[in-house]
């Protein structure tokens, strides 16, 4: 069995490959000792690691491991997944939305990191907790899926009520900017959490589009663990990308790009 692991700040993504078949699983980074214990009990012919906590795993296992830079691993793994899923892109920006968000440009040959922001899954969990007292990510994202942002976010169309706006009316003018106009509204946890996911998706998308225009590509690929159990985030990102004139791509198992890439970079 061959194993690739991306040990991130919040989640550890694990890919096992045997007989040309892959299996995927995740574990919370706070349970890294359990991952180490599991690895020490397996018969592994190749182990490849990436991510900020790769060194912690390597220091505590009884088998040799190779460690790779997470940006290179993510790019390698993403390229494999894009090809397997039928996406033939000459170049693209990819946004890796994990705890935070890292932005990269792939020119057809290699990747380069072109930016990063602190907005991502960490903000969804942290700000989401402050607004709802929910700590479980699945419960939080489940609750957000049917939330209504209309009384919370101020849209361009809310400002240009009786005239044609100079930009699309569905663009957000101010996240959370509609709240003071609806003080008698029922701001349910579901609505508040939907607004949090909205601001994360729109900020990530805006940054991705900005660098896409800088590098003259219309293709933006979104990956990362923040999309897990979060159809709303995916919809916000895809809709906003199209609204701003670019082409969004979502890759199945994209959160495991780093783990897959590390495995294929390994000798």
UniProtKB/Swiss-Prot annotation:
An annotated GO cellular component: cytosol
GO molecular function: ATP binding; pantothenate kinase activity
Record's catalysed reaction(s): (R)-pantothenate + ATP = (R)-4'-phosphopantothenate + ADP + H(+)
Pathway(s) annotated for this protein in UniProt: Cofactor biosynthesis; coenzyme A biosynthesis; CoA from (R)-pantothenate: step 1/5
Keyword set, alphabetical order: ATP-binding, Coenzyme A biosynthesis, Cytoplasm, Kinase, Nucleotide-binding, Transferase
Subunit and interaction comment: Homodimer.
HAMAP family, per database record: Pantothen_kinase_2 (MF_01273)
Protein name per the record: Type II pantothenate kinase
